[in-house]
Design a protein with these regions (language model features):
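Non-catalytic terminal accessory segments
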Residues: 1-68, 110
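Binuclear metal-dependent hydrolase catalytic cores centered on His/Asp/Glu-rich metal-binding motifs
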Residues: 155-171, 183-218, 224-226, 287-288
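Solvent-exposed loop/turn segments at secondary-structure junctions
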Residues: 90, 121-124, 149-153, 180, ...
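Membrane-embedded segments
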Residues: 78-173
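Beta-strand-turn-beta hairpins that frame and shape the catalytic cleft
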Residues: 73-83, 172, 179-190, 209-212, ...
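Conserved beta-sheet core of the metallophosphoesterase superfamily
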Residues: 221-298
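Active-site neighborhood of phospho(di)ester-bond hydrolases with catalytic His/Asp-centered motifs
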Residues: 83-86, 114-120, 142-149, 175-178, ...
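Extended recognition/assembly regions associated with phosphoester-bond processing machinery
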Residues: 15-17, 68-73, 206-213, 217, ...
Length: 300
């Protein structure tokens, strides 16, 4: 709990500094500009610092709050309209109000069959989890969730028990190496434990070797390479944040994957995989070049 408060204090403090830095730069410039009036390099440096600061402010306060919808069609053999949300990271960076906005948008999607929440639901949360995640209770469609590494102490606090209870109280079905059958859609859904937390039970998948219409939810897309003698029709994942700070030619080196996943659709030897770039942030509190996303996946 102490770590929770330290992380939140650090984020609030650095965010405050970002906001006041332009004022400090302006005051500094006003104070010393007469000494450097005839030096173009000085003006270039000042302009550069202002631009960098405003870019950081945009990446901290503006782009993370832009929520877009992305539509994708995938051939799977079963027909469904799935809303995929991932990595909301409610806690240090994203608030309950942010989650309310997400749920409002999800509820406005026509003809959705169900919602998948692909893990990393929290990020150093403070307070009662049931209250923090209460917007989930307003979902108009069934919702199925798995945990991510930040929900399973890899890294982060170990809050699995509390999180499971909070999700269930808010009408979200929690799956950890568990399955359910959606009879109306004829789809078998398996939700796996987190890969980084070493909680993936591949034996659970062995039960579905000869089953058609198999949908797997796994937080990290790398999980598919732990599948043994099975090839699901579709695996839904998150975890990558699409790089989060999407600087061309650089961001891919910082994506937490061993197999080159970024965001979007992949056809692999282990089956079809769709990776959401998600809604939240970890590490640096910035999101740039990759707005928060709600994925709408129509399978056929």
């Amino acid at each position: 709990m102490i770590l929770h408060y330290i992380v939140n204090y650090f984020i609030n403090y650095t965010s405050f500094l970002l906001l006041i830095t332009p004022i400090l730069l302006f005051l500094l410039y006003s104070k010393i500009k007469d000494k450097f009036t005839n030096k173009p390099l000085f003006k270039i440096v000042v302009i550069f610092l202002f631009l960098i600061n405003f870019l950081l402010i945009y990446a901290r306060f503006v782009e993370p709050n832009i929520i877009v919808e992305k539509q994708t069609s995938i051939e799977t053999g079963f027909k469904a309209k799935i809303v995929l949300i991932s990595d909301p990271h409610i806690g240090a960076y994203n608030s309950t109000r942010f989650l309310e906005r997400v749920i409002e948008k999800v509820n406005n999607i026509d003809d959705a069959d169900f919602v998948v929440i692909a893990g990393d639901i929290t990020y150093y949360p403070i307070g009662d989890l049931t209250t923090l995640l209460s917007p989930f209770k307003n979902l108009k469609r069934p919702a199925y969730a798995v945990l991510g590494n930040h929900d399973s102490q890899a890294p982060g606090p170990y809050i699995e028990k509390e999180l499971k209870e909070a999700l269930e109280k808010n009408n979200v079905i929690f799956l950890k190496n568990e399955d359910l059958y959606l009879e109306d859609l004829n789809i078998h859904v398996v939700g796996l434990g987190d890969l980084l937390a070493e909680e993936v039970d591949t034996k659970k998948l062995d039960e579905f070797k000869d089953v058609e219409n198999l949908l797997v939810i796994a937080h990290s897309p790398d999980t598919v390479y732990s599948y043994e003698d099975i090839k699901p029709d579709l695996t839904l994942s998150g975890h990558t944040h699409g790089g989060q700070i999407r600087i061309p030619f650089i961001y891919k080196y910082f994506i937490p994957t061993k197999y080159g996943f970024d965001e979007g659709f992949y056809e692999t030897e282990k089956g079809k995989v769709y990776v959401s770039s998600g809604l939240g942030m970890t590490g640096l509190p910035f999101r740039l070049g990759i707005p928060s996303v709600i994925d709408i996946i129509e399978t056929y």
